[in-house]
Amino acid sequence: MALSYLRPWVSLLLADMALLGLLQGSLGNLLPQGLPGLWIEGTLRLGVLWGLLKVGELLGLVGTLLPLLCLATPLFFSLRALVGGTASTSVVRVASASWGWLLAGYGAVALSWAVWAVLSPAGVQEKEPGQENRTLMKRLLKLSRPDLPFLIAAFFFLVVAVWGETLIPRYSGRVIDILGGDFDPDAFASAIFFMCLFSVGSSFSAGCRGGSFLFTMSRINLRIREQLFSSLLRQDLGFFQETKTGELNSRLSSDTSLMSRWLPFNANILLRSLVKVVGLYFFMLQVSPRLTFLSLLDLPLTIAAEKVYNPRHQAVLKEIQDAVAKAGQVVREAVGGLQTVRSFGAEEQEVSHYKEALERCRQLWWRRDLEKDVYLVIRRVMALGMQVLILNCGVQQILAGEVTRGGLLSFLLYQEEVGQYVRNLVYMYGDMLSNVGAAEKVFSYLDRKPNLPQPGILAPPWLEGRVEFQDVSFSYPRRPEKPVLQGLTFTLHPGTVTALVGPNGSGKSTVAALLQNLYQPTGGQLLLDGEPLTEYDHHYLHRQVVLVGQEPVLFSGSVKDNIAYGLRDCEDAQVMAAAQAACADDFIGEMTNGINTEIGEKGGQLAVGQKQRLAIARALVRNPRVLILDEATSALDAQCEQALQNWRSQGDRTMLVIAHRLHTVQNADQVLVLKQGRLVEHDQLRDGQDVYAHLVQQRLEA
């Protein structure tokens, strides 16, 4: 472990010694004298060492600190020359200088490594996210391709706005020079006019630019959310058992928002800053090349500060994402099960859980804000030091007659702006990595292949409804070692009612889930009219095989929306016919708007029996050939049960009833008893076998 960690550094030292030996000989004689030769030497060292380490796959943190090692000496002598005001300052080459200069370079690298090791979060040094991030960025760009016209318009307005903003300080300097010298009314009026013109034009263009980027952001956000939601609904049930609801909600809300702002928001700031920096440096060079080169020294300082700050910032942002998702999960569980929470008097316990989750969020927010404040203080101190240095050199140039007072004012305004935009450019790198991190999670869901067979195409015009379980076994994906069903073999015949009974955990609901094609058997075959269930078209199958659960799930919307759920072009007459068959027409008729009455979230405005009737009507409106009732009549009165019995007698439908009551079993034509996933009994009703008699006796005693 230790040897593999030291290998890049040892390789760097040996390669650098060999290269410096070459530069000390005939190769070094080819280099020019002074600062140009020093910079060529540093650049040559950087390129060769970078290439060798890249070939050996040894870059990592060494590659991050390599520019400091190779360019620290040229930067030092360049700074001394710029501050002193002369480029003829004697310089030394690292290859031919004393060992002190080389040790100083490696000392700076060692100090930087120590700072990096202390301030960077664990694991950052070992990460190599470049290639992966580039792939994700390409996918984000591809996702934004439909909005290319709006992005082009936004970029046009961006260039116009930035150019206008860049010219304003130039004319401000002219005004100062006019007021400080011989006053020329025409020149003064011209300068003021152009200042106003560029101010108004840049403001208008900036508004158009921002509007175009925001419009693009909203379009991308909608597109990502639609694709993600569509992908989630196609996943297998095992995925939802393994993934928390709070995590899915977080991906659909916060992560998709981060993704949608990646291109519009970052492109807005990135391109604006880039164009602004280029334009500002152009005008700064016209004022004073010496001051311009001096201001360039702020770049490595800014990059170094961001290099330390960004990994910490990204790490804490990821922790905040997880903490917020957990806090949201507590709220959703408590509110979703409020009746249970209240019935057990657990309000204070849930509040305590939420306070703990919020406290974790607060600690992370405080840590994020503290680190950001410390970083901003360091940046402002560095900016102030650079400004003082430029002022000192600027005064020397004014005294030498090289720069006017107005020119120095323009330069200081430019320099303040360019520092801000350079920081924006460097900051955008970290922000883009943050958003790409969110995109990685979303893309993992978009790319996930559901553990489901390929959809079938069978959709016969008529279905008999004969169901055959042939030696069917099943285990849930999360517990493959624990079989739920073992070797089930039975047939459900059209025109018969089969009761499936057994103790809790025997596998009754799993049989219903397999019959709906929600899971696939791990062994054996499940046939419908002699064809494997997976061969049928998805929508066709779920029109022909329908389940009504003991606790029906309803959705916010009207009565009609819930009965006709999943159906297209379902007429009101069909809805009312199904409601009448389910004995739901009486309470629907008493509602204010009939079948168009809103029933609230999860059908909260209905009683339990009314919910079951709507769920039965939702199944009957499809006119299924196979109907599964998971004790779905437990909350119905005798009249409604009789109406359902009448519907059963119409047509040769196949019916499977998961029974928990003696009354339901007595009305069945066939009884199947499950125990520990095995079919214990498969005889006709009222044969009086021991297992079934024992079950009936237990029910009567209960």
From Swiss-Prot:
Keyword check for Acetylation: no
Transmembrane feature ranges: 7-27, 57-77, 99-119, 148-168, 187-207, 266-286, 293-313, 374-394, 408-428
Stated name of the protein: Antigen peptide transporter 2
Quaternary structure and interacting proteins, as annotated: Heterodimer of TAP1 and TAP2 (TAP1-TAP2). A component of the peptide loading complex (PLC), interacts via TAPBP with MHCI heterodimer; this interaction mediates peptide-MHCI assembly.
InterPro entries assigned to the protein according to its UniProt record, in alphabetical order: AAA+_ATPase, ABC1_TM_dom, ABC1_TM_sf, ABC_Tap-like, ABC_transporter-like_ATP-bd, ABC_transporter-like_CS, P-loop_NTPase, Tap2/ABCB3
SUPFAM superfamilies the UniProt entry points to: ABC transporter transmembrane region (SSF90123), P-loop containing nucleoside triphosphate hydrolases (SSF52540)
Function: ABC transporter associated with antigen processing. In complex with TAP1 mediates unidirectional translocation of peptide antigens from cytosol to endoplasmic reticulum (ER) for loading onto MHC class I (MHCI) molecules. Uses the chemical energy of ATP to export peptides against the concentration gradient. During the transport cycle alternates between 'inward-facing' state with peptide binding site facing the cytosol to 'outward-facing' state with peptide binding site facing the ER lumen.
Lumenal side: 1-6, 78-98, 169-186, 287-292, 395-407
Membrane topology type: Multi-pass membrane protein
Organism: Mus musculus
Example of a GO cellular component annotation carried by this entry: nuclear speck
Entry keyword annotation includes Magnesium: yes
Gene responsible for this protein: Tap2
Residues carrying the site annotation Inter-subunit salt bridge with TAPBP: 16
Disulfide bonds: none
Free-text comment about domains: The peptide-binding site is shared between the cytoplasmic loops of TAP1 and TAP2. The nucleotide-binding domain (NBD) mediates ATP hydrolysis coupled to peptide translocation. Two ATP molecules are accommodated at distinct nucleotide binding sites (NBS) at TAP1-TAP2 dimer interface. Each NBS is formed by Walker A (GxxGxGKST) and Q-loop motifs from NBD of one subunit, while the NBD from the second subunit completes the active site by contributing the C loop motif (LSGGQ). Each ATP molecule is coordinated via the beta- and gamma-phosphates to a Mg2+ ion, which is necessary for ATP hydrolysis.
Keywords: Adaptive immunity, ATP-binding, Endoplasmic reticulum, Immunity, Magnesium, Membrane, Metal-binding, Nucleotide-binding, Peptide transport, Protein transport, Translocase, Transmembrane, Transmembrane helix, Transport
